[in-house]
UniProtKB/Swiss-Prot annotation:
Binding site for Zn(2+): 3
Xref: CDD domains: NTR_TIMP (cd03585)
InterPro entries for the chain: Netrin_domain, TIMP, TIMP-like_OB-fold, TIMP_C, TIMP_CS
Family: Belongs to the protease inhibitor I35 (TIMP) family.
Annotated protein name in UniProt: Metalloproteinase inhibitor 2
Subunit text: Interacts (via the C-terminal) with MMP2 (via the C-terminal PEX domain); the interaction inhibits the MMP2 activity.
Residue numbers marked as site, Involved in metalloproteinase-binding: 16, 37, 43
Entry's Gene Ontology BP terms: negative regulation of membrane protein ectodomain proteolysis; response to cytokine; response to hormone
Molecular functions (GO terms): metal ion binding; metalloendopeptidase inhibitor activity; protease binding
Cell compartment(s), UniProt: Secreted
SUPFAM superfamilies reported for this sequence: TIMP-like
Length: 196
């Protein structure tokens, strides 16, 4: 059996998560986390992490991240060794702990666009009352004014497209929501995207 998740825009990932941090994994080990309904032990991977910055979450730094032992059950594998930095969004478990799955937004920090990094500070939060609706194929429509249509899949066949990288869906004063372009990307990057 495989893990299946529906794709989300980074803003949705931010809004849905209890905890959003920038961190690196220092070590990993398999731990027991209680038993399942049949009495079999449940194994989880425990990553000890070094939190660099918290964008959303509890007052206490996150020290440990837990995940399922294999990707088939949505487990996430992080590089340990403390070199690679990640943006990690997931569920709080209290007392400096969080749980992550493959359906959560977990990406190497250096793959984020400047706009995405900046949006983590407040812009995504400003749009949490808006709804981002993914358009899997044309035509697609919004059903209420507080929705933004996420078109990356149709226009670029990628969920990591232009709107994911450079836009946030923000509520305007009249209550409607609209895509708002963040920090202008560097010219070269912009030109590359314009290429047919």
């Amino acid at each position: 059996r495989a893990c299946s998740c529906s794709p989300v825009h980074p803003q949705q990932a931010f809004c849905n998560a209890d905890v959003v941090i920038r961190a690196k994994a220092v070590s990993e080990k398999e731990v027991d986390s209680g038993n399942d309904i049949y009495g079999n032990p449940i194994k989880r991977i425990q990553y000890e992490i070094k939190q660099i910055k918290m964008f959303k979450g509890p007052d206490k730094d996150i020290e440990f991240i837990y995940t399922a032992p294999s990707s088939a059950v949505c487990g996430v594998s992080l590089d340990v060794g403390g070199k690679k930095e990640y943006l990690i969004a997931g569920k709080a478990e209290g007392d400096g702990k969080m749980h992550i799955t493959l359906c959560d937004f977990i990406v190497p920090w250096d793959t984020l666009s400047t706009t995405q990094k900046k949006s983590l500070n407040h812009r995504y939060q400003m749009g949490c009352e808006c709804k981002i609706t993914r358009c899997p194929m044309i035509p697609c429509y919004i059903s209420s004014p507080d929705e933004c249509l996420w078109m990356d899949w149709v226009t670029e066949k990628s969920i990591n497209g232009h709107q994911a990288k450079f836009f946030a869906c923000i509520k305007r004063s009249d209550g409607s929501c609209a895509w708002y372009r963040g920090a202008a990307p560097p010219k070269q990057e912009f030109l590359d995207i314009e290429d047919p």
